[in-house]
C-alpha cells in the first residue's frame, strides 16, 4: 500500500489491523512500528538495494499428540516438501533456507497450543539469525499459524526464545487442511519473521498500510480465491490477492512484490544478520 507517515502519527493511531481469524495469528506491536521506522522511511525514499543472497539455517520441530499424522506427527518427506516450497517462494528475492535439524516431541499440551513459552525454551535452537519452525496439531487461537516480528531481544530472554513460527501441521504440503495444504502458511508466517505486515494492514487508509509502496490498498484479508477483488475502490489498484501476505487460499498465492523483497532484505540485515 502506498503510504505517508510520521512517527507521532504512527504511534498515536494504534491502527494495527487484525489478521483473518482463521489464517494468521501474527499481530505487529507499536514497538515494532517504531523499531522499523528507519527502514520504512528508507524504502519510501527508494534508497534501498537488494543485498547479497542470505542463507537462513532452519530448524524443524514436530510437536504432536501421538505418532499419528492426524495428531500432528508429520513425516520427514512432508518437511522436505515444505522446505522446497519455502525455497521456491523466497529464492527470487535473495533468501534460501538450509535444513539444520529436526526434533520430534510427543506432548499433548504443547501440540494443542498450551505452554508455548516452555515448549520453545525446551526446543529452540540456534541464533536470532536462524529460523525455528514449530509444527503443531492446533494453535491456541485456532489460526493456521503465528510468528513474532523481529526485534532486538537479549539472548536467553523470553522475547529471544519465542522468536520463530508456530505452524498448523496440517498446512504443510500433503496435509489435510482444506484449501491450505500446499505449504504457503509457512511461507506467509516467514514473511512476518522477515518483517512484513499483512497486505491489508491499515485497511483502506492512505496513511499507514503495510509500509510497502507497491502493494495496493486492501480493506481486509481475502477469503477463498476470487478472480478479482477491489475492497478499496477509492484507492488505486486491485487487491493483491495473489500475494503471499494476503490470506487467500494456497492455490491463489504466488508472489511477493519487489518492495516487499527489499523490505525483507533490509529488515533481516538490521535485526537478524550476525545475531
UniProtKB/Swiss-Prot annotation:
GO terms for molecular function: metal ion binding; metallopeptidase activity. Keywords: Disulfide bond, Glycoprotein, Hydrolase, Metal-binding, Metalloprotease, Protease, Secreted, Signal, Virulence, Zinc. It comes from the Eukaryota. Zn(2+) binds at residues 188, 192. One of its GO terms (cellular component) is extracellular region. Residues 1-19 form the signal peptide. Pfam families: Peptidase_M43 (PF05572). Gene3D superfamilies: Collagenase (Catalytic Domain). Glycans are attached at residues 101, 220. Its EC number is 3.4.24.-. Disulfide bonds join 225-252. GO terms for biological process: proteolysis. Its main location: secreted. InterPro entries: MetalloPept_cat_dom_sf (IPR024079), Peptidase_M43 (IPR008754). Secreted metalloproteinase that allows assimilation of proteinaceous substrates. Plays a pivotal role as a pathogenicity determinant during infections and contributes to the ability of the pathogen to persist within the mammalian host. This is Extracellular metalloprotease MGYG_03559. It comes from Arthroderma gypseum (strain ATCC MYA-4604 / CBS 118893) (Microsporum gypseum). The lineage of its organism: Eukaryota, Fungi, Dikarya, Ascomycota, Pezizomycotina.
Amino acid at each position: 500500500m502506498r503510504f505517508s507517515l510520521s512517527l507521532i502519527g504512527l504511534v498515536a493511531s494504534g491502527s494495527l489491523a487484525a489478521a483473518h481469524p482463521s489464517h494468521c495469528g501474527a499481530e505487529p506491536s507499536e514497538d515494532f512500528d517504531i523499531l522499523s521506522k528507519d527502514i520504512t522511511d528508507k524504502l519510501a525514499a527508494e534508497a534501498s538495494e537488494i543485498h547479497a543472497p542470505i542463507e537462513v539455517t532452519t530448524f524443524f520441530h514436530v510437536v504432536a499428540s501421538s505418532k499419528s499424522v492426524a495428531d500432528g506427527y508429520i513425516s520427514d518427506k512432508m518437511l522436505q516438501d515444505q522446505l522446497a516450497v519455502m525455497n521456491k517462494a523466497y529464492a527470487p528475492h535473495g533468501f534460501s533456507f538450509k535444513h539444520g535439524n529436526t526434533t520430534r516431541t510427543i506432548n499433548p499440551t504443547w501440540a494443542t497450543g498450551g505452554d508455548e513459552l516452555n515448549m520453545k525454551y525446551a526446543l529452540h535452537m540456534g541464533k536470532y539469525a536462524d529460523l525455528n519452525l514449530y509444527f503443531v496439531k492446533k494453535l491456541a487461537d485456532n489460526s493456521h499459524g503465528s510468528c513474532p516480528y523481529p526485534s532486538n531481544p537479549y539472548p536467553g530472554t523470553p522475547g529471544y526464545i519465542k522468536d520463530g513460527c508456530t505452524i498448523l501441521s496440517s498446512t504443510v504440503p500433503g496435509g489435510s487442511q482444506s484449501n491450505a495444504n500446499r505449504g504457503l502458511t509457512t511461507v506467509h508466517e516467514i514473511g512476518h519473521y522477515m518483517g512484513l505486515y499483512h497486505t491489508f494492514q491499515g485497511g483502506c487508509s492512505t496513511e499507514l498500510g503495510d509500509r510497502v509502496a507497491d502493494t495496493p490498498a486492501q480493506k481486509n484479508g481475502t477469503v477463498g480465491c476470487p478472480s478479482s477483488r477491489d475492497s478499496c475502490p477509492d484507492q488505486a489498484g486491485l487487491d493483491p490477492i495473489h500475494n503471499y501476505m494476503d490470506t487467500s487460499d494456497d492455490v491463489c498465492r504466488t508472489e511477493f512484490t519487489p518492495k516487499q523483497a527489499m523490505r525483507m532484505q533490509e529488515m533481516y540485515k538490521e535485526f537478524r544478520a550476525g545475531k
